[in-house]
Amino acid sequence: MGTTNGCAADSVAATYYDSQDADQFYEQVWGGEDIHIGLYATPDEAIATASDRTVHALLDLADPLPQGGCVVDLGAGYGGASRRLARWSERPVHAINISAVENDRHRRLNVDAGLEQQITVHDASFEQVPMADASADLVWSQDAILHAGDRAKVLAEVSRLLKPGGCFVFTDPMAADGVEMGLLQPILDRIHLPDLASPSRYKAWGEAVGLTMEVWDERTEMLVRHYDRVRQDTRLRRAELETSISSGYLDRMDVGLGHWVDGGQQGRLSWGLMRLRKPG
């Protein structure tokens, strides 16, 4: 990305996700466990069910893991994936997240799940992860790196963290390859970003730091379905949601979700599952 200072981008993301409105919205509409795009079996499937399916699809991409290292979750949100990773991998999980509000909820949920000793939640940016080189077998991220001030630097951190043979599995809302950023201005304005990554840019950033793209499973239709599903659910539950979320926030969210749906339908956006590997 490179056009936004990393600290400034961190501040924008933290301010947004730390707000009471955002915290309540993601808890009530997404279910309070995950904050990422779902893989839907049917158009009207529950958001939480579809979101959980994405986690399992990424777990399939990560399997099998090498032995001996830990797992790092970049942009861990409420920790839904971190808890699944802890149970699945049976090894330490380090959750990196900039939002103090999300991290507080994450820690409480870890205690409820009996996983507080296995999962360490770091109040940190994924551009400067407070961990040693070559310490992770798996780095994981879901729909978070778009908020980074320098996405190439995030890929460099991933390469630094991974042990030889380890892999990085992730999803991220992106621009379709070759799309001019001006065509995405309504989306960029909504999320306070100058641009989005693209599949080819992630491939190039990975190669520049020694990571090879092994899998690119394009599922852009799920981005469209997800944001449309969230918008429908928000509209149906408007009266209920207004008891804890401001009407202005809900109005802005409705408009923003519409921009994502339109961009996906117009072929200007891209989303899917990716795996990059550090050669052994």
Swiss-Prot record:
GO molecular-function terms, A-Z: dimethylglycine N-methyltransferase activity
Pathway(s) of this molecule: Amine and polyamine biosynthesis; betaine biosynthesis via glycine pathway; betaine from glycine: step 3/3
UniProt-listed Pfam families: Methyltransf_11 (PF08241)
Single Gene Ontology BP annotation: glycine betaine biosynthetic process from glycine
Disulphide bridges: none
Keyword tags: Methyltransferase, S-adenosyl-L-methionine, Transferase
Gene3D superfamilies attached to this UniProt entry: Vaccinia Virus protein VP39
Reactions listed under catalytic activity: N,N-dimethylglycine + S-adenosyl-L-methionine = glycine betaine + S-adenosyl-L-homocysteine + H(+)
Subunit structure, as described in the record: Monomer.
Protein name, as recorded: Dimethylglycine N-methyltransferase
Naturally occurring in which organism (per UniProt): Parasynechococcus marenigrum (strain WH8102)
Gene: bsmB
